Regions:
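Bacterial N-terminal signal peptides that target proteins for export
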Residues: 2-19
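C-terminal motif of bacterial Sec signal peptides marking the signal peptidase cleavage site
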Residues: 25-28
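Bacterial signal peptide processing site
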Residues: 30-33
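N-terminal secretory signal peptides
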Residues: 35, 40-101
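A short, polar/proline- and glycine-enriched secondary-structure boundary/capping micro-motif
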Residues: 72-73, 100-105, 165-170
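Mature extracytoplasmic domains of secretory-pathway proteins
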Residues: 82-128
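Helix-rich interaction surfaces within compact, conserved domain-sized segments
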Residues: 115-175
Length: 175
């Protein structure tokens, strides 16, 4: 290739390079905008599903993490969770901590099925609901306080008059 052809080639390349870069950037921005719109639509769909589930009063939460009062946070392995259906609760949660007054022969953690004595549901802020439940079991009252966020994430605080407080986090089961 002669020097003259090489110079013409580089001039052509330098003239086309900004257009190629602009085309790539425009494609990337269009893809990003499309992805952003798709993500917003998915978030809206999940928020709508969460609203319907909370309004129905029947929900299942799968727990991923536990934060005991006297220990470090732990990732939960296994099928831990809580199911609320009508006026009953099915709790399958571990308990780590101090028990102040225990029944003899019953070492089940927070694993039980029972009736809900009280229920209160409210929209706390624009991005989450508070669902508070009271369960009266044998010698203790358990207070389950769920914060159910529009993105399907859930935090749960379990308080008792006979045990340390436990905090859990997990995901709302959306079918």
């Amino acid at each position: 290739m002669t020097m003259m052809k090489r110079c013409a080639y580089f001039r052509l390349l330098s003239a086309l390079m900004p257009m190629a870069v602009a085309a790539v950037l425009m494609t990337a921005c269009a893809t990003t905008a499309e992805t952003r719109e798709r993500r917003a639509a998915e978030q809206q769909r999940i928020a709508q599903a969460v609203e319907e589930i909370v309004a129905s009063g029947d929900f299942t939460v799968e727990m991923n993490y536990v934060n005991p009062q006297r220990m470090r946070s732990k990732m939960l392995t296994g099928e831990y969770g809580v199911t609320v259906k009508g006026d009953s609760i099915d709790s399958y949660l571990p308990f780590f901590g101090r028990v102040y007054r225990a029944e003899f022969g019953i070492q089940t953690g927070l694993r039980f099925e029972d009736k809900i004595a009280q229920r209160q549901v409210k929209r706390a802020r624009k991005d989450y609901y508070e669902v508070d439940l009271v369960v009266k079991r044998h010698m203790e009252h358990l207070f389950y306080s769920f914060d159910i966020y529009d993105n399907g994430k859930v935090t749960l605080m379990v308080r008792s008059d006979n045990r340390d407080t436990m905090h859990f986090s997990g995901d709302l089961v959306i079918e």
